[in-house]
């Protein structure tokens, strides 16, 4: 049984930890609001751009279609761009994204496909490296980035397009976590090269408007598709930041509550043990007095 001194030290230690988790919860809450606003602001733009591109794509067929839209005509080599957080202490946020990417990679490998991986964020890279170290061809470090900007996504997009033009892969899938609420972040896989069938369906439901394009649709697609790839990556990164802050706020709130419960239990144990010690000392005093 621990001594009273040990119990006092443990209570003090847990209280210090509770202050840290409470502070981290408040910081995450402050960052969450800005991150959520940024993610929600990016959604309409990225969704509308995808719909416009899909609408234009309906007017471009055959040899006129850009390679980024038409693809290579093969399905042999897959590139997975896995976006996670640079830091932990956010519950299962990173592991859920990594698990989705891992399961997808396993499925492709079981089908005899070739898989290549680009990791964005340290935590996801650490998880995937345990099983797919030889498949990771590049890692993007955003740890020193204080304010996420479009240029960071654009650099990743250019890297992906460069690999595609070099014939390094046939299909590219983006993995991230879509922010729904503080307690709900949904791991998501989005095919960005070639354009997925979902984009075409989105265009078909966009309305019956008829557009005239200047210059020709093929030229517009050649310019907009590379930018759309960067836009989709930027949206994924913004969704991730919001999801990370939401998960961190929830995790630190749980940690703070658990610390409070532990302090209560330790305090009860301390008080009982102290009471027992006082009772024992009183009995010894009374026994000594009676002996006299």
From Swiss-Prot:
CDD domains in alphabetical order: F1-ATPase_gamma
Disulphides: none
InterPro entries, per the entry: ATP_synth_F1_ATPase_gsu, ATP_synth_F1_gsu, ATP_synth_F1_gsu_CS
Keywords: ATP synthesis, Cell inner membrane, Cell membrane, CF(1), Hydrogen ion transport, Ion transport, Membrane, Transport
Pfam families listed in its UniProt record: ATP-synt (PF00231)
Main subcellular location of this protein, as a coarse class: membrane
Membrane topology: Peripheral membrane protein
Molecular-function GO terms, alphabetical: ATP binding; proton-transporting ATP synthase activity, rotational mechanism
Domain of life of the organism encoding this protein: Bacteria
A Gene Ontology BP annotation from the UniProt entry: proton motive force-driven plasma membrane ATP synthesis
KW Cell membrane (keyword) present: yes
Record field: transmembrane: none
Compartment list: Cell inner membrane
Family: Belongs to the ATPase gamma chain family.
Role according to the record: Produces ATP from ADP in the presence of a proton gradient across the membrane. The gamma chain is believed to be important in regulating ATPase activity and the flow of protons through the CF(0) complex.
NCBIfam families: ATPsyn_F1gamma, PRK05621.1-4
Summary of subunit composition and partner proteins: F-type ATPases have 2 components, CF(1) - the catalytic core - and CF(0) - the membrane proton channel. CF(1) has five subunits: alpha(3), beta(3), gamma(1), delta(1), epsilon(1). CF(0) has three main subunits: a, b and c.
Listed HAMAP family: ATP_synth_gamma_bact (MF_00815)
Protein name: ATP synthase gamma chain
Biological source species: Brucella anthropi (strain ATCC 49188 / DSM 6882 / CCUG 24695 / JCM 21032 / LMG 3331 / NBRC 15819 / NCTC 12168 / Alc 37) (Ochrobactrum anthropi)
Lineage: Bacteria, Pseudomonadati, Pseudomonadota, Alphaproteobacteria, Hyphomicrobiales
């Amino acid at each position: 049984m621990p001594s009273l001194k040990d119990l006092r030290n443990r209570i003090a230690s847990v209280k210090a930890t509770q202050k840290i988790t409470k502070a981290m919860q408040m910081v995450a809450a402050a960052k969450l609001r800005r991150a959520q606003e940024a993610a929600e602001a990016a959604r309409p733009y990225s969704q509308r751009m995808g719909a416009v591109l899909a609408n234009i794509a309906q007017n471009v067929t055959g040899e006129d279609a850009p390679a980024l839209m038409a693809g290579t005509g093969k399905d042999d080599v897959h590139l997975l761009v896995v976006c996670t957080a640079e830091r932990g202490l956010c519950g299962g946020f990173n592991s859920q994204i990594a698990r989705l990417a891992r399961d997808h990679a396993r499925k492709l490998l079981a089908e005899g496909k070739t898989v290549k991986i680009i990791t964005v964020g340290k935590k996801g890279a650490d998880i995937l490296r345990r099983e797919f170290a030889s498949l990771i061809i590049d890692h993007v470090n955003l740890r020193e980035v204080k304010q996420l900007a479009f240029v960071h996504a654009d650099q990743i997009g250019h890297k992906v397009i460069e690999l595609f033009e070099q014939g390094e892969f046939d299909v590219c899938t983006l993995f991230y976590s879509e922010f729904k609420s503080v307690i709900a972040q949904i791991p998501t896989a989005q095919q960005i090269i070639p354009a997925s069938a979902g984009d075409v369906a989105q265009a078909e439901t966009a309305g019956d408007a008829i557009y005239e394009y200047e210059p020709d649709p093929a030229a517009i697609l050649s310019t907009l598709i590379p930018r759309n790839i960067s836009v989709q990556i930027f949206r994924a990164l913004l969704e991730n930041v919001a999801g990370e802050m939401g998960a961190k706020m929830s995790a630190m709130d749980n940690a703070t509550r658990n610390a409070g419960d532990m302090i209560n239990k330790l305090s009860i144990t301390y008080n009982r043990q102290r009471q027992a010690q006082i009772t024992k000392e009183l009995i010894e005093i009374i026994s000594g007095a009676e002996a006299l």
